[in-house]
Design a protein with these regions (language model features):
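Feature targets compositionally biased, intrinsically disordered low-complexity regions
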Residues: 5-8, 19, 24, 53-57, ...
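N-terminal hydrophobic or amphipathic segments with adjacent small-residue motifs
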Residues: 11-14, 141, 194, 200-201
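Surface-exposed beta-strand edges and flanking loops
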Residues: 53, 99-101, 132, 267-270
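Gly/Pro-biased beta-strand-loop elements
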Residues: 75-195
Length: 282
């Protein structure tokens, strides 16, 4: 999908800001008073919103009759993040990656990037096609795991080689998780030129393949800008894996146990995308 551009893009972002603010109000009601809320916002969106609503004496402009499909998808992805992430995780992460591993649908096989600004607003950056697992039995079941994940600070590799698939995994950023009792081999990494044509389809052995230029960009960005102390995710013995719901380890005083990592939170789910949202400025 192309990024939002020009006046149409600003109007779309304005409606996105309105939607985010409504969700933020709901979040505030649900969370404890001291908790920060996260909503969709941007300076451009606020400027466009003022233009759309009219700046003179509260006068309003003509209705916007055609909602932007990109807006609907971005709002949907942001809403899924808001609903999934526990409030006590927000202070520890700056970048949020949403991945839909669905085979079909508006959000399917795409990664959406959001970052948190100084006011704790969740700001949309961009989205692009990816390839997740083929979801079938091969050498093993080629499934991409779902849930909330941190990135493993000890497994950022510019050129990893998979002995299982006898394939290179450039710019590999492994998930920091134990699944089925062992450290996962699932990573976000470059598709490489040979598999780039398959982006937007289920095509991997379980990893999340990214466009080559995006994999390199995120790899360097996270290493340069996002290192910090993050919560240690708890182990879910019922499902024999690291918690995918964002449950964290706490000490005897109830404080989160922190460890060096990346302030990046990844949410992967099998969700195709909801119906198009109708947003009208009346």
């Amino acid at each position: 999908m192309d990024n939002l551009r020009g006046v149409a893009g600003l109007a779309a972002l304005a409606m996105l800001a309105m939607t985010g603010l409504m969700h933020a109000g709901q979040i505030r009601d649900a969370l404890e008073p001291a908790a920060s809320t996260v909503r969709i916002a941007s300076t451009q969106a606020n400027d466009a919103l003022r233009l759309a609503m009219g700046g003179q004496g509260g006068q309003k402009s003509a209705p916007v009759a055609e909602p932007d499909p990109q807006l609907a998808m971005t709002t949907d992805a942001a809403g899924r993040l808001r609903d999934k992430i526990p409030a006590d995780l927000y202070p520890y992460f700056d970048v949020y990656l949403y991945v839909s591993k669905a085979a079909e649908g508006a959000l399917a096989q795409h990664l959406y990037i959001f970052h948190k600004d100084a006011a704790n607003n969740l700001v949309y950056e961009e989205n692009f096609p990816v390839s997740t697992g083929r979801e079938r039995h091969e050498r093993y079941f080629t499934s991409t795991p779902v849930g909330l994940f941190e990135l493993d600070p000890n497994r950022f590799e510019t050129s990893h080689y998979s002995r299982t698939w006898h394939a290179r995994m450039p710019w590999a950023m492994f998930l920091n998780a134990t699944i089925h009792g062992k450290q996962t081999g699932v990573a976000l990494h470059s598709s490489g030129n040979a598999h780039a044509v398959l982006l937007g389809n289920r095509a991997s052995g379980g990893c999340v393949r990214l466009p080559p230029e995006k994999a390199a960009e995120l790899f360097h960005r996270f290493q340069k800008e996002e290192q910090g102390m993050v919560p240690v995710f708890a182990y879910d013995s019922t499902h024999n894996r690291t918690s995918g719901d964002g449950l964290i380890v706490r000490d005897s005083s109830g404080n989160p146990v922190l460890a060096p990592g990346y302030r990046v939170l990844v949410f992967i789910e099998d969700y195709p995308g909801g119906p198009a949202l109708v947003a009208v400025v009346a």
